Amino acid sequence: MASNVEAPEPWYLALLGFAEHFRTSSPPKIRLCVHCLQAVFQFEPPQRIEARTHLQLGSVLYHHTKNIELAKDHLEKAWYIAQQVPQFEDVKFEAASILSEIFCQQNLVDSAKPLLRKAIQISQQTPYWHCRLLFQLAQLHTLEKDLVSACDLLGVGAEYARVVGSEYTRALFTLSKGMLMLMEKKLSEVHPLLTLCGTIVENWQGNPIQKESLRVFFLILQVTHYLDAGQVKSVKPCLKQLQQCIQTISTLHDDEILPNNPADLFHWLPKEHMCVLVYLVTVMHSMQAGYLEKAQKYTDKALMQLEKLKMLDSSPILSTFQVILLEHIIMCRLVTGHKATALQEISQVCQLCQQSPRLFTNHAAQLHTLLGLYCISVNCMDNAEAQFTTALQLTSHQELWTFIVTNLASVYIREGNRHQEFSQFKHSK
């Protein structure tokens, strides 16, 4: 509660204490926690307590139960009531943030966007929430593959962070924008942006872990930029710096970061995730450079690390890392003739994608492509053709499309359908 508000009633503190006790029990007693919070409304509390309780109920129901509709109802009430209460930013914007997550989960993106836009509009005097909501809306546009709108929002965020004196968060916004520009293959525009990022990162003096994490983000983008441009030899110095950064971060204490500027209250990735990501880009470089044994060695290390992390951490990004690593190592196995192992790993990718609709949508074309390559390796040309044809229908990625067409062409040549089938490519893209 804010200091300028009267002390809360004893009944409220008692119910809140019980609710928190049940929530943090092992195992959590969510039903009892919810009952305690619902009991608050029996006392007809003032608006501040009413709004906060609706937020707490919505958050508990969203994170710990499947009753999403009831969670949404409480969060909508929290958002509505909190807008009528002065100086109640945390409740107001947290309600908007979680509510927009639920809308996205329910594919109600057209409800999430205006909610986030309004929250962004009225949060300009609250730097932490303004930046967080900008990141959230940019992420929503990215998931919709509207990278232009996402880049615009990240640009707005970078300028806002500069104005409020947060060079750290300005760097995060700018690096995020650079990442999206790499996704769009805007290589000529990425170079000056990365140069700016490098300057901001090197000049920023602050928490050592935050500084090293910015440096890792920057170097990851540099490596990706060089690999996209086919400049494999230019990657080595960046990889060496990345490995040094990870070693430095691992020696730093993970104390809670409490910066003076509230706009600095962000962190890119946990250091354990960064470690896996460095393994991943090392594997990508090794594959492009033709160092297949090295690629296998780093993939094995990364997958072992991922298995340990996933026992304690349910973050979706870990499954994404795992799928990308497996996609690379499967290519390695097929090139080196380890077909049975490749098939087992393709099965692992299938299982991971089945657990996440978004992962399946993003990797279905790659999965069918890998199956097609496996079919070629065991001389099942009809099956290879079917897999590649399906993959073509699922991808809008130009480089993957070219790779699939090249392999499909090799299938047609082996089958003797060269002239008849090549004509189809003219109309397929």
Q: Positions of the model-derived regions?
A:
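N-terminal alpha-helical scaffolding segments that mark the starts
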Residues: 1-61, 65-67, 147
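Short coil/turn linker motifs that delimit alpha-helical repeat modules in TPR/alpha-solenoid proteins
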Residues: 7-8, 29, 45-48, 66, ...
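Residue register of alpha-helical TPR repeats
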Residues: 10-14, 35, 52-54, 73, ...
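Structural motif corresponding to the intra-repeat A-B loop/turn of tetratricopeptide repeats
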Residues: 27, 64-65, 106, 137, ...
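Amphipathic alpha-helical segments of tetratricopeptide repeats
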Residues: 37-43, 76-84, 117-124, 155-163, ...
